[in-house]
Amino acid sequence: MPVTDRSVPSLLQERADQQPDSTAYTYIDYGSDPKGFADSLTWSQVYSRACIIAEELKLCGLPGDRVAVLAPQGLEYVLAFLGALQAGFIAVPLSTPQYGIHDDRVSAVLQDSKPVAILTTSSVVGDVTKYAASHDGQPAPVVVEVDLLDLDSPRQMPAFSRQHTGAAYLQYTSGSTRTPAGVIVSHTNVIANVTQSMYGYFGDPAKIPTGTVVSWLPLYHDMGLILGICAPLVARRRAVLMSPMSFLRRPARWMQLLATSGRCFSAAPNFAFELAVRRTSDQDMAGLDLRDVVGIVSGSERIHVATVRRFIERFAPYNLSPTAIRPSYGLAEATLYVAAPEAGAAPKTVRFDYEQLTAGQARPCGTDGSVGTELISYGSPDPSSVRIVNPETMVENPPGVVGEIWVHGDHVTMGYWQKPKQTAQVFDAKLVDPAPAAPEGPWLRTGDLGVISDGELFIMGRIKDLLIVDGRNHYPDDIEATIQEITGGRAAAIAVPDDITEQLVAIIEFKRRGSTAEEVMLKLRSVKREVTSAISKSHSLRVADLVLVSPGSIPITTSGKIRRSACVERYRSDGFKRLDVAV
């Protein structure tokens, strides 16, 4: 598919022309009906309503201006996003502000992007209007309630330009290691990345299955936006959507939708696979079959090998194929998708020598009983688009040497909104002494540590999250995975400096269990002993402090990533309310 002369609006018009009566998006509302109330739109309805919203927006500004979308999960969010693009504006997808709580992130993004309009719905307009303030002398954005527009009125569709070669939307990063920045995603980026991912997941274009996209992911998040709105449009698929809250309240709903949507494709972070295993009963799955699930992407956060195994084992009796589970690596700066294992392959893991890994060398464990770290493979990426580079020298690393993952291609986005210096540092990297087949640049510096071993990509974590304890490098994701296998809850491994060096501290969310205070204390002591022993055995590390806290205490981003720097600050200021204070 040529991507240089296509845009999201042109594809939407094409779908409306070629498949006017085919269902495009279905939203299942479990809030109004516990059994799920389904509401659907055809491609012609989506196109006509997006055009009406675009007409309304043209009264607010000019193409290239920003339009924020602050609406609940649902069809109105889909229409608002596509309407902004239809008018040639730059969409800014955001979450709805929490009721009764000032949302600093929403305020910061609106101040940075300076939208001329905010698209919302009547159900939340009271909360949204509070954020419609003027910034730097510019007029306050116009608030448009999408559901109150006459979206069904028959009218001649206006002639919009089919060429939208510039920015489509700003995807604000979750800010796990820095202040959120707006990633500028172009129409070309979207179409290229969806196309790349389809080829990556299914190989031969002729083998790309028709079917349905199933998603509960928030539409303001990069994976939810691409999966729930853009992929159905680019890949000619129907989408079945529900809200994140509907999933969290009853994870079995996700599995039931997968079993009843025919040939379908979905995606979720690691924690969702764990929730589905723990909270989907045999009764929930009675009479259901998952044999038609062609793919479930696991991405957006560190993938735990044990979780993948539990998920496959839990749903094997319902004919879920192991090859349907697709571990994937990506980031917003590359639109979404970067790498995944080859089509038809079940998830593969390799156990690497831990001591060598802390020294930056990836050597598979032998049979000598050495302590190993099990990592999941992300397949064999195209060398022209993915390289492992020494972040200090900018020279490509040989296979087996850990370095920074660099990415190149049409899916690499345009940079950070209004941040030229940061854009140059991250998006315009050049290889020193590149190999004959490698382009010199520009390369995207992902900030992620990875390695190519036996031709396959393995990922360790973020460079900025690297723990240096006793003069050795340690990967917090590995330590957290060890803890979570014991406690089952969220954990944060952080390095806290003392007068001489840095010490390992683990913050562990734990649900108090026990009918008496004495039983609770005994359980907490037992957990601390077990975690301390496991970290010592698996990582050759001494834990300076284990902090047991209630669920929800660890700071996270809007996409669920641990804010480790915030954990350090909170720990040093005694900001965590410890369950183990008397242990």
From Swiss-Prot:
Its EC number is 6.2.1.59. GO terms for cellular component: plasma membrane. GO terms for molecular function: adenylyltransferase activity; ligase activity. It catalyses: holo-[(phenol)carboxyphthiodiolenone synthase] + a long-chain fatty acid + ATP = a long-chain fatty acyl-[(phenol)carboxyphthiodiolenone synthase] + AMP + diphosphate; eicosanoate + holo-[(phenol)carboxyphthiodiolenone synthase] + ATP = icosanoyl-[(phenol)carboxyphthiodiolenone synthase] + AMP + diphosphate; holo-[(phenol)carboxyphthiodiolenone synthase] + docosanoate + ATP = docosanoyl-[(phenol)carboxyphthiodiolenone synthase] + AMP + diphosphate. Pfam families: AMP-binding (PF00501), AMP-dom_DIP2-like (PF23024). Pathway: Lipid metabolism; fatty acid biosynthesis. GO terms for biological process: Actinobacterium-type cell wall biogenesis; fatty acid biosynthetic process; lipid biosynthetic process. Gene3D superfamilies: 3.30.300.30, N-terminal domain of ligase-like. Disruption phenotype: Disruption of the gene abolishes the production of phthiocerol dimycocerosate (DIM A) and of phthiodiolone dimycocerosate (DIM B). Mutant can still produce mycoside B. The keyword Lipid metabolism applies. Keywords: Fatty acid metabolism, Ligase, Lipid metabolism. Belongs to the ATP-dependent AMP-binding enzyme family. Catalyzes the activation of long-chain fatty acids as acyl-adenylates (acyl-AMP), which are then transferred to the multifunctional polyketide synthase PpsA for further chain extension. Catalyzes the adenylation of the long-chain fatty acids eicosanoate (C20) or docosanoate (C22), and potentially the very-long-chain fatty acid lignocerate (C24). Involved in the biosynthesis of phthiocerol dimycocerosate (DIM A) and phthiodiolone dimycocerosate (DIM B). This is Long-chain-fatty-acid--AMP ligase FadD26. It comes from Mycobacterium bovis (strain ATCC BAA-935 / AF2122/97). The gene is fadD26.
